[in-house]
Amino acid sequence: MARLVALDRVRNIGIMAHIDAGKTTTTERILYYTGRLHRMGEVHDGGATMDWMEQEKERGITITSAATTCFWTPKFGNYQGINHRINIIDTPGHVDFTVEVERSLRVLDGAVALFCAVGGVEPQSETVWRQANKYGVPRIAYINKMDRTGANFFDAVKSIRERLGANPVPLQIPIGEGEMFAGFVDLIRMKGIIYDKEDGSTYQEVEIPHDLQNEAKAWRINMLEAVSEHDDTLLEKYLNGEDITDEEVRKVLRQATLQVTIIPILCGSSFKNKGVQFMLDAVIEYLASPVDVPAVEGHHPRTEEPISRKPTDEEPFAALAFKIATDPFVGKLTFFRVYSGVLKAGSYVLNTITGKKERVGRVLQMHSNKREDIEAVYCGDIAAAVGLKDVKTGDTLCDENNPVVLEKMVFPEPVIQIAIEPKTKSDSDKLGMSLAKLAEEDPTFKVKTDEETGQTLIAGMGELHLEILVDRLRREFKVDANVGKPQVAYRETIRKSVEFEGKFVRQSGGKGQFGLVNLKVEPLEEGKGYEFVDAIKGGVIPREYIPAVNAGIQEAMKGGVVAGFPMQDVRVTLFDGKYHEVDSSEMAFKIAGSIGFKGAAKKADPVLLEPIMKVEVVTPEEYLGDVMGDLSSRRGHIEGMGQRAGAQFVAAKVPLSSMFGYSTDLRSMSQGRANYSMEFECYREVPRNIAESLQEKRTSKDAE
């Protein structure tokens, strides 16, 4: 089967935004206009195609990033009349599902950033924007909900410049705002576009309304100045007052967008069907095809030698698995992005992370939760494989004769955990397996057993995250479970450098045990995790015992030394030691490593850490005092405040332990008129009185 669409006519895009900016509605409209849907779905009536889990339809929010493919032929511009394929990943906007956004951005070549014309840049917009910056994803911005009361296009553009530090360049300005929103002025072609009041897919091209002509000219000059800064020839023409063609403007705009030095700005109302077709034209015109993206970098699994794979069908096959999902009909689905080469259904791939070879039974093209079997998947495409058993998110799949490891994805550690127990004996049998499946799909969801109580603990990124996973247990896996109160995932670390000798000796007739290690422990900066340095010289400890020392240290770190919480941000150097020809063993050195670490950590000024959350509350002015007072009473530190979209906002850093049940309290405090967003910021030292009470709990638990 030959490639259907030339590689330079493919666009892999994501739609990213704050929770209520209209992401799913916009995707629905895209699918409608590209002919994939025959009836438009609405989020508010639970009929949207991309929201395919039951909870998503109930809550009206998107949780998993569904992948779909569609085709579009631009009506205007440098690609006019040429059919293109668009692969879309619809990403969630709720902060608890950051991992879904992170992993979809990793495999995209471009994104449409949606902003609400009333709210402008909101907290989650900032988070998603930072993630897109991390992966250098080119973006266009679409200011949605122009029909809403209080919509202000220019305020939204200003907030993109000020809050995101971006360089927004409007390519359109609205004709009317709020109920009066009728269409927009196209600043490249200097034409007005007026939409039919009843049917938004019908529009008329008109001369620019008289009262907007001066404003349109001013914004066109703004656009030309911004664009000409990126091209010397254009700059010369502009300064000499020569005519600049639309084609030249678009060409340089495309280059600047791909370099992420300009963010083209469009406007519309997806719900009212205004502006979506022009946004699709802009996706084709300004966002990258796989050909525009640099060769993907990786390394050889054995030699660590750098390898790059060019985006062509002729290169050996290399792909990144970016999502695992359980499908009720075909079982485990592995979503992957092909960076080079071709994969045929039925062929074998090598997973260079596990070292295992696996057969791809079927290759599926996904349309939300419907699927279509395809014979082969080509470079630049996004598809799903059936039949891969041992693949995890972030694994590299490649041609077995040309192994490569692509850069792995790094996911944040969970900050909240709850105990979970099955309601009945039959639930008990299924619980472990079901939780394992959910953990396989979501790298920020962890399952562990409390060694002292035997309880199963589940950990995640927030209350909503865990609530939805427990809900999925009930709906998809038919497992009923009781859950405990949320607990904070405290951590421990050290503040001083210390050297210590760890010794394990047991000699009581027969073969004994002997291991002696000299360790130096020192603090690392926050977020660095754990580092082990092997500084053994002259074979004072044989090579084969050193991994055992490392394993012993890591085991000891899990239980901490202050209140039984895992330790982080520590470097341990093994610099000396002794061994015995007969009595030494891996086990002896593992125990010596554990003893040495615990002894050193106790002397290294150990402290307890707690997760601090970045909280932003938007509230009507009359409740501002109450909101601020309440945040302060929760040990919150107010970082800033101001006005946004006719309301007040307060930004604060608050310990997670003080935020449980906050949504209920905020609702009653503001009669349901305030809302808030919360995301993990960092770990900070716990105040002494709280640390002492946590230690007391630990001591009384040990005494039991």
From Swiss-Prot:
Transmembrane segments: none annotated. GTP binds at residues 17-24, 90-94, 144-147. SMART domains: EFG_C (SM00838), EFG_IV (SM00889). It is found in: Cytoplasm. GO terms for biological process: ribosome disassembly. InterPro entries: EFG_II (IPR041095), EFG_III (IPR009022), EFG_III/V (IPR035647), EFG_IV (IPR047872), EFG_V (IPR035649), EFG_V-like (IPR000640), EFTu-like_2 (IPR004161), G_TR_CS (IPR031157). Belongs to the TRAFAC class translation factor GTPase superfamily. Classic translation factor GTPase family. EF-G/EF-2 subfamily. This is Elongation factor G. It comes from Chlorobium chlorochromatii (strain CaD3). The lineage of its organism: Bacteria, Pseudomonadati, Chlorobiota, Chlorobiia, Chlorobiales. The gene is fusA.
